[in-house]
Amino acid sequence: MTAQNNYFLVEGKYNTARVFSQKRDETAVEQIAAICSNAAYKNSQIRIMPDYHPGLGSVIGFTATLENRIIPNTVGVDINCGMHCSRLGKVEINFRLLDQFIRSSIPHGFKHNQKISPRIPSDIKEEIVRVSKKLGLGADNQLKGIGSLGGGNHFIEINQAENGDKYLVIHSGSRNFGLQICNYHQKQAYQYCRQQYKKAADLELKVEYDLNKSNSFLEGKLAAEYYQDMKVAQKYADLNRKIMAERILEFLELEALASFQTRHNYINFEDHIIRKGAVSAHQDEKILIPLNMRDGSILARGLGNPD
């Protein structure tokens, strides 16, 4: 532990990660060490958040600079899982009626809408149809998923700030669409690494490609293809949350005073950082971090820490 900087280091074969925490979760540390021992991230700057914990495919609270290789399972199946936040002001809400509306009108769990939402822009619809066809999916079913909550830790709630303002907060992602994209490209990654392993003459290079189905990586044209599909999934998730918010606000007969989204499971193609259970916090960037049902969420602005 480096007391002054409040982090400890986890080393692997190719890289060393900084973990900004005073506590060691050994299961999560093993996952971090495995990441640092994967050639996909040998040139990345890896930083782990204070609330890190074990995850499926990767440790949660993971950030790394995007280099030439990518493991689809790092971001995982719920591409662009994140938060939509709308400030409503000091309004009165009938929570019983709102609860009834949400339960009856916003599909949750494995359910989706009966019809495709007319709110979906035509250009995004075309992109979703294109990716669906490539993956052998029914495009209509994927489109019907837009405007649905999903399951797990996804939620819709009304929060109240200390000043009395109420906020509509929605936590959801890319539904089955993101899952299918991840699974397709992770399979591609395994096949690619197997091929490269067989072709490699150099022993060290052979070791880099000697990976299993869950931690194989993509590079070159295959990585670019994954990024292209991922960008569509990220649009899907943003739109999914936005449409749910619009429907709820229409029911409440309210207009949002301000709205924004905070994503915590995605690749940011502007700052080229992979985030898994972590958010962007550039200087003055508005962010929302969900805590739990007791404490609600944190509204904050980024400090732009370069580390």
Where are these regions (language model features)?
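Domain-length cofactor-binding catalytic modules of enzymes
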Residues: 2-34, 41-48, 54-62, 68-72, ...
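Acidic active-site catalytic centers that drive phospho-/nucleotidyl reactions
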Residues: 50-51, 78
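N-terminal cap/recognition module
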Residues: 68-89
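Short coil/turn segments at secondary-structure boundaries
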Residues: 113-118
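Active-site acidic/histidine clusters and adjacent loop/turn architecture
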Residues: 120-123
